[in-house]
Design a protein with these regions (language model features):
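Bateman/CBS regulatory modules and CBS-like beta-alpha motifs in cytosolic regions of diverse proteins
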Residues: 1-28, 34, 40-42, 46-47, ...
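Structured interaction and signal-relay segments at domain junctions
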Residues: 51-64
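Conserved small/polar residues in nucleotide/adenosyl-binding loops
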Residues: 124-128
């Protein structure tokens, strides 16, 4: 079975760029109710995932942080504890399932590492 059958395309998925500010990332994650979000560079390549935990540990370095200051802190300066590993669009189901067992979502990239969407666990664990 083709894994693209389960794909939420990039156009339907929230993501952030690695040059976004902390405030932009926080507001995007809050708006979409995401605990983790794909991060891309401006060329559209998947560079990793930023999580609520990454943000919390990163903000610990700043004293008296407020939303105004968060507009000047860039997300690429935050250490990421564990990036979600992407799968290629032509991967097989076995590879997808092994990744999905340890990740909230599985990023999918094309053969040039361009982000094309995500596959979520709910899509293929649902009985319907």
């Amino acid at each position: 079975m083709n894994i693209l059958f389960f794909l939420h395309p990039k156009q339907e998925v929230a993501y952030v760029y690695d040059d976004c500010t902390l405030r932009q990332v926080l507001e995007t994650m809050e708006h979409h109710k995401y605990a983790s979000i794909p991060m891309l560079n401006r060329q559209g390549e998947y560079v990793g995932t930023i999580t609520e935990g990454d943000l919390l540990w990163g903000m610990k370095k700043y004293t008296n942080l407020n939303l105004k200051e968060a507009e000047h802190i860039f997300i690429h300066d935050f250490e990421r504890k564990a990036d979600y590993v992407a799968v290629a669009a032509d991967s097989d189901m076995k590879d997808l399932i092994s990744r999905a067992m340890s990740q909230n979502f599985v990023p999918v990239v094309d053969d040039q590492n361009k982000f094309i969407g995500i596959i979520t666990c709910l899509l293929y664990t649902s009985p319907s």
